[in-house]
């Protein structure tokens, strides 16, 4: 068994697609519309056939409340791993509002950014490779 898809709720699909592709650097994997519904996913350019991030409209009141609560509490809705958080911060900082610049914490260095769609995302560089 493996993880193939994870959801992140967003308030605007086009804005989310722009952020996750043009700012974060992912690639659009799937973009299909049918009857007012749009299935939109992005993936890592390093693993385009790997795990996909489903950008899902927060039309459901429970989803919207959950998203807002996480944001207000400063909790990231998604965490992405990198081998160089400072490099990714420098690449993204002019186009993204970082709530936390690269910061050393126990076992890793992290940075947190506003995805412009109602979420905080966290970029994480582990101190060592876990096996």
Description of each model-found segment:
Residues 10-13:
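Conserved beta-strand-loop-alpha-helix junction that forms the acyl-donor binding cleft
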Residues 84:
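Conserved catalytic-loop position in the HRD/HxD motif
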Residues 1-5, 27-80, 89-116, 124-131:
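Vicinal oxygen chelate
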Residues 16-21, 92, 118:
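Conserved active-site tyrosine of GNAT-family acetyltransferases
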């Amino acid at each position: 068994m493996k993880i193939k898809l994870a959801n992140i709720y967003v308030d605007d699909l086009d804005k989310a697609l722009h952020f996750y592709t043009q700012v974060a650097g992912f690639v659009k994997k799937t973009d299909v519309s049918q009857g007012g519904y749009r299935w939109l996913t992005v993936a890592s350019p390093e693993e385009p056939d790997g795990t996909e991030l489903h950008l899902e409209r927060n039309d459901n009141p429970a989803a919207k409340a959950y998203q807002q609560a996480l944001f207000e509490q400063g909790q990231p809705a998604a965490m992405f791993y990198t081998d160089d958080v400072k490099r990714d911060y420098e690449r993204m900082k002019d186009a993204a509002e970082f709530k936390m610049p690269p910061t050393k914490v126990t076992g890793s260095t992290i940075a947190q950014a506003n995805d412009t769609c109602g979420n905080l995302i966290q970029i994480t560089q582990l101190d060592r490779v876990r096996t």
